[in-house]
């Protein structure tokens, strides 16, 4: 029986387990070799574990933190065996993630005292940003909220059209303008429309271009400033969407966007079919940003609220 608190439905847990299967099997095949013939956790085992964590895209800095924590546990209990290593690893990684966000993950909910709740979504093209927005709209509508989408990624006609398709599929209103329109103008109109409709949630899609950090910074700053003319404290969340299957490249994306704007949460997509699931742990720790959602499949239901305990349980069990 897991030592973690059970709050997921069995169906969601099964989806999570399946989505992380490749990361888990790759990790454990390496771990099994690392501890072969060993009964105690010694320096060689820890060195091997360090290599495994780095190769799983946990990242060097985060890996060293984890190893230091395990070394402390080993020094406190000289009789710790390799059979207990996995359990210790799970506990320490869960503790590390808890330091970034101590809250318990819940279903798709927003603060009750904020209306409309404004979520601005950033991320490079191709990471699944627009798809994530569509799935979020579906989940929030399913939870009983009135959702409005804003197509402020105006530099790609495909982005506007894709968001329109999601709006039609989910059955939520969308505010859009022509390709090349001012993104801030779209965001402004979206918030005005949301206020008029007494919407609960506004999700704003933004341009995913990284070729010029200064332009990106200026654009996102302007979008924020203009939104605040309608909703004073908007946006309430700036969520960076990253592709979990890209491994170390995801770290670079996070570095670029956190330099351009304040990022308050992460959504990690495409974790199914990749062995790079450790990126969830590394990016959250390195940038001190909580993971809110993870994508573990292509289905509309396969965007899940991130629960650190269930994630660690699925990854390391």
Regions found by a protein language model. Give the residues of each.
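Primarily NTPase-proximal linker/entry elements flanking Walker-type ATP/GTP-binding cores
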Residues: 17-152, 159-179, 187-195, 199-204
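Short glycine-rich anion-binding loops that position phosphate/pyrophosphate groups of nucleotides
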Residues: 207-209
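Short, aromatic- and cysteine-enriched interfacial helices/patches
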Residues: 3-10, 28, 35-36
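Short beta-alpha junctions and helix-cap segments that line functional grooves
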Residues: 3, 106-107, 136, 252-253, ...
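Conserved catalytic-core segment of NTP-binding enzymes
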Residues: 162, 182-197, 211-317
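Switch/coupling subdomain of P-loop NTPase systems
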Residues: 4, 10-16, 21
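Short hydrophobic/aromatic residue motifs in ordered secondary structure
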Residues: 60-62, 156, 272, 300
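Residue-level signal for short, function-critical loop segments
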Residues: 153-154, 244
């Amino acid at each position: 029986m897991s030592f973690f608190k059970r709050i997921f439905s069995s169906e969601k847990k099964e989806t999570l387990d399946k989505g992380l299967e490749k990361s888990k099997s790759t990790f454990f095949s390496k771990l099994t070799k690392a501890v072969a013939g060993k009964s105690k956790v010694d320096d060689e085992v820890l060195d091997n574990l360090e290599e495994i964590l780095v190769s799983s895209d946990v990242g060097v800095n985060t890996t060293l933190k984890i190893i230091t924590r395990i070394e402390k546990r080993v020094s406190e209990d000289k009789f710790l065996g390799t059979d207990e290593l996995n359990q210790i690893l799970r506990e320490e990684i869960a503790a590390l993630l808890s330091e970034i966000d101590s809250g318990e993950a819940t279903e798709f909910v927003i603060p009750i005292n904020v209306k409309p709740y404004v979520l601005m979504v950033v991320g490079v093209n191709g990471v699944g940003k627009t798809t994530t927005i569509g799935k979020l709209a579906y989940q929030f509508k399913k939870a009983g909220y009135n959702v409005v989408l804003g197509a402020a990624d105006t530099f790609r006609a495909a982005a506007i059209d894709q968001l329109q398709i999601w709006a039609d599929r989910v059955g939520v209103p969308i505010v859009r303008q022509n390709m090349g329109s001012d993104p801030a103008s779209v965001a402004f109109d979206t918030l005005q429309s949301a206020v008029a409709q007494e919407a609960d949630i506004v999700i704003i899609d933004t341009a995913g271009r990284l070729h010029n950090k200064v332009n990106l910074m200026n654009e996102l700053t302007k979008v924020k400033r203009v939104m605040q003319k309608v909703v004073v404290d908007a946006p309430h969340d700036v969520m960076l969407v990253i592709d979990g299957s890209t491994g170390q490249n995801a770290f670079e994306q996070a570095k670029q966007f956190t330099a351009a704007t304040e990022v308050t949460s992460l959504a990690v997509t495409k974790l199914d079919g990749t062995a790079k699931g450790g990126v969830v742990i590394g990016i959250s720790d390195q940038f001190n940003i909580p993971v809110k959602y993870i994508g573990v499949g292509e289905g509309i239901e396969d965007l899940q609220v991130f629960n650190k305990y269930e994630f660690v349980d699925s990854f390391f069990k």
